[in-house]
Amino acid sequence: MSTVCLSMIVKNETHIIHECLESMWNKIDYWVIVDTGSTDGTQELIKKFFADKGIPGELHERPWVGFGVNRSEALALCDGKADYAWMIDADDKIEGDFRYPNNKNLVADGYALKCGRDQCIWWRNQIFKTGIGWKYTGILHEYANCDKQPIHQEKIEGNYHLEARTLGNRNVNITQVEKYTKDAEMLLQALETDPTNSRYQFYLAQSYFDSQQWDKATEAYYKRVEMGGWEEECYYSLFRVALVAMSQQKDWAIIQQKLLDAYDYRPCRAEPLHIIARSLRMMGRVRAACMFAKQAAQIPHPPQDILFIDTNVYRWMALDEVGSTAFYTHEYQTGYAVCAKLLKENLLPPSEIERVRKNLEAYTQKLQEIEAANRAAQQAQAEAVKLQTPASPTESKSSYIPPRAARFKQRK
């Protein structure tokens, strides 16, 4: 069985680190934590926590240089202490049922974990084989690379995620706009000396987006796309350009075209089509909405993608758009099937169950009305044949329900 050493860099984390350590202590055999200048008692909290748990380890104190340098130093200090090092931020924590593969008999050089925030997931290397030269690169949004080449990397699947909370010391006493404005300034300066660094360019655009500098974000995203390279990052840049246009309340025709640009770039991603479907439905354009919703619902969760995937779109939201619009296109059987699937397979969050149940009832009633009308028509036709007189058409007594009908519920 492989041994695992917890690896962290910390500074003034007493307000948040206990939750992280509680989620990690039963998954490790040793710990090596580097403090970069805490003045709030973080060091004592860490030592007491692990002493109470009976887990050996060591605390080092080092001056702050930068994320890449300090993380690399923390990883190097794990060499010889365990077979693997698990790097985690003080404000992150493991949620769910995490299990090591192969009963903790680890074989890969590195393992990517499923990270999440709100509806979004992404995969990131967090567990590294020690002694083979893993290092972090970058001033912000740093990433791990390895001296050993080629390397064997795997994902650890399962019903868990690493909750990325952005609640650490870097987020204290500062607004999100201020934080990401500072990040943008740092990345812009870094790009002056390394202008071909596509990762810096992408996170410059992200920082502009998160600091609500919309025009700069659009320009930076398009520049990232022009640089080429990783297709997922280019796709997401185009997708965010569309979200910027939505934030700026631009004309729908412009927004829709930008969403279609993102979809055309990476048609295995359903998020752009889902937004189009939902937006059209809210405009009352239910037939067009249903068309886009059905296309989005046909796209499975992309198993090969690792960057910023809205899992709810693939789990239930695209299907729900079909269920919310098929009634108005007279595709009652389709709407019934979708609502039944959402309920039967427990795909919905609790807040949506009653609404979808009412929609299923509306579809059921409509299908029963159609079936009754068909039976009546068939019976009338049979009677007419007996009398050897021409059959007269029978109209359904049910009427078209307009989009604002009270008995059919749409998601807001």
Indicate residue ranges for each PLM-predicted region.
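Residue at a conserved register position within TPR or TPR-like alpha-solenoid repeats
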Residues: 208, 245-246, 280, 326, ...
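Structural motif corresponding to the intra-repeat A-B loop/turn of tetratricopeptide repeats
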Residues: 211, 248-249, 283, 329, ...
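Catalytic-site signature of metal-activated, phosphate-bearing donor transferases
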Residues: 68-75, 82, 86-88, 92-219, ...
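A conserved acidic beta->alpha catalytic loop
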Residues: 23, 27, 34-46, 63-64
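Short, well-formed alpha-helical segments that are part of the catalytic scaffolds
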Residues: 7-30
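Conserved donor nucleotide-binding strand/loop of the catalytic core
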Residues: 44-73, 77
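"A position-specific structural signal for the A-helix of alpha-solenoid helical repeats
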Residues: 203, 240, 275, 282, ...
